[in-house]
Swiss-Prot record:
Biological function: Required for the maintenance of the structure of the mitochondrial inner membrane. Involved in mitochondrial morphology. Causes growth arrest when highly overexpressed.
UniProt feature, compositional bias: Low complexity: 372-412
Annotated localization: Mitochondrion inner membrane
Main location class: mitochondrion
Protein name, entry field: Sensitive to high expression protein 9 homolog, mitochondrial
Biased composition regions of type Basic and acidic residues, renumbered to the chain: 65-74, 113-140
Phylogenetic lineage: Eukaryota, Fungi, Dikarya, Ascomycota, Pezizomycotina
GO cellular component assignments: mitochondrial inner membrane
Length: 504
């Protein structure tokens, strides 16, 4: 057997060994499987000054921390009495590099997923809308949406119309009249209640009078047979005499209540009549104001019409006439130029045809030219005057028809230049005379158009034309319409004059 000191010494050694192993096995820092709290600090210590870059790096950092925490939750939930040998301090340096290596790899992956989700979210609505536009469900949904909007609008239409009418009444001053109408309705209800109360007070007063008269009648009957009273008659007499005072007080109270009810009814009737009179007065004032506004509006419209009439007669009508005259002059000048070019073409065309005629025709033309040259001057003058008269009197078509007839006589030979000169000398004055005659006719037609008169002259001419002796033809319908319009205008003017002159 061992001694007690030896046993105590062994027990102390075993306890010391246990305490040493527990102190050596338990680490002072977090286990390797715990969350790496220094990774965020390393990223935050980056020397980037850009705030946007730091902000973009934060979500990935937080996601990595949350992942590490989710991974470490099962390890943290293990029992505290785990085997100390499994968690040695030599394993912590290996686990920390692994955890530190997970953060840089997780950040790009998170950024890629976020960007992919954003692209899908952006591309999804457009594709869905393009696909759904042709579907019956999409059309039905649109129809139901539009029908709901239409029903809401129709439901709000009545309220909107009511609000618009209320605003119009506020502007015209009819809202106060509506308030008076409501006050009159309240006064009528009050008068009705007061009259009902008066009727009830009358009934109660009549009942009190009947009750007191009945008790007095019975008392008088008992007094008439006073010598033959029985004990019951004596008790009845004392009871009636005692109730007589009560009946008298009740009669007085009912009389006062009746007088108060009648007074209240009279006050309600007076207030009602006063409200009715004030409403009638306000309605008269409102109707006068509306009538006056309508009168001024009518006068304003008439003034606008007169102003527009004056503007058109003074400014627009002369401008329109000048424009028409100018346009007509331009058209006439254009027609004259066109006629001039046509005449020039028709005169040059026979000369070209003369150059291509036969020798026999050229000989005949030479003979005719010799004859024309051998004529005396007086005959030449007569022929010139006749030709000018014919050219001015005839049209362009006649000139073109007569020129081919005279062209054979005007074709000279190559060896006779004198007849050619005389033919050209006779054709040019004819062409000039035709052009001058046409110009004179156009000028005479333009001279017939009177110049546009001024505003004062036009008014003077119109006024003189109204009272002139010019004879016109008019139908019975037009005459009847003019008479009716004149009568209506006279009645309207007289009504306006009477409304303005009428004493207020």
């Amino acid at each position: 057997m061992q001694s007690m000191p030896l046993l105590l010494r062994q027990s102390l050694r075993s306890s010391a060994n246990l305490t040493r192993t527990s102190r050596q096995v338990r680490p002072r820092f977090l286990p390797a499987a715990g969350p790496n709290i220094y990774a965020a600090r390393d990223i935050r210590r980056s020397f980037s000054v850009c705030v946007q870059c730091q902000f973009r790096s934060q979500p990935t950092l937080y996601l990595s921390l949350e992942k590490d925490k989710s991974k470490d939750e099962p390890v943290a939930q293990q029992p505290n009495d785990m085997d100390p040998v499994t968690t040695s301090p030599h394993e912590t340096p290996k686990a920390q590099p692994e955890a530190e290596g997970e953060h840089p790899s997780s950040a790009p992956a998170e950024q890629e997923t976020v960007s992919r989700l954003e692209e899908e979210f952006k591309n999804e609505p457009a594709s869905e809308t393009t696909e759904k536009r042709g579907l019956p469900s999409y059309l039905e949904e649109r129809r139901s949406k539009y029908s709901k909007q239409f029903t809401e609008m129709m439901d709000n239409l009545q309220s909107n119309v009511f609000v618009a009418g209320q605003r119009l009444n506020d502007l015209t001053g009819y809202s106060s009249i509506e308030a008076l109408k409501k006050d009159i309705q309240v006064q009528e209800e009050r008068l009705r209640t007061a009259r009902l109360r008066v009727r009830e007070a009358k009934d109660s007063y009549a009942a009190a009078i009947n009750r007191r008269s009945a008790s007095q009648r019975e008392v008088n009957e008992l007094l008439q047979r006073k010598h033959a009273w029985s004990p019951a008659d004596l008790e009845r007499f004392t009871h009636l005499y005692r109730n007589d005072h009560t009946n008298e007080v009740a009669e007085m109270e009912t009389q006062e209540a009746l007088s108060a009810a009648e007074r209240e009814s009279e006050e309600a009737a007076a207030q009602l009549s006063k409200s009715i009179l004030s409403r009638y007065h306000e309605e008269q004032v409102w109707s006068d104001k509306i009538r006056r506004m309508s009168t001024w509006g009518t006068w304003g419209l008439m003034g606008v019409n007169v102003l527009l009439f004056l503007i058109f007669q003074i400014a627009v009508e002369p401008w329109r006439r000048k424009r028409l005259v100018k346009g007509f002059e331009e058209k006439v000048i254009e027609a004259i130029e066109k006629e001039k070019t046509l005449n020039h073409i028709e005169i040059l065309h026979p000369q070209n045809t003369l150059s291509s005629t036969s020798p026999a025709s050229q000989e005949e033309a030479a003979e005719t030219s010799i004859l024309t040259t051998s004529e005396p001057p007086a005959a030449a003058d007569e022929t010139a005057t006749t030709t000018t008269a014919t050219t001015t009197a005839t049209t362009t078509s006649e000139i073109s028809a007569s020129e081919p007839e005279t062209t054979p006589a005007a074709a000279p030979k190559a060896d006779e230049p004198a007849p050619v000169l005389t033919l050209e000398a006779t054709e040019e004055p004819a062409h000039k005379n035709a052009v001058t005659g046409l110009l004179d006719s156009c000028k005479s037609q333009l001279a017939r158009i009177p110049p546009p008169p001024s505003a004062v002259e036009s008014w003077r001419q119109t006024f003189h034309d109204l009272f002139s002796d010019r004879s016109i033809s008019i139908t019975q319908r037009d005459l009847t319409s003019v008479a009716l319009q004149s009568a209506a205008a006279g009645a309207a003017i007289m009504g306006l004059v009477i409304a303005l002159i009428r004493p207020r």
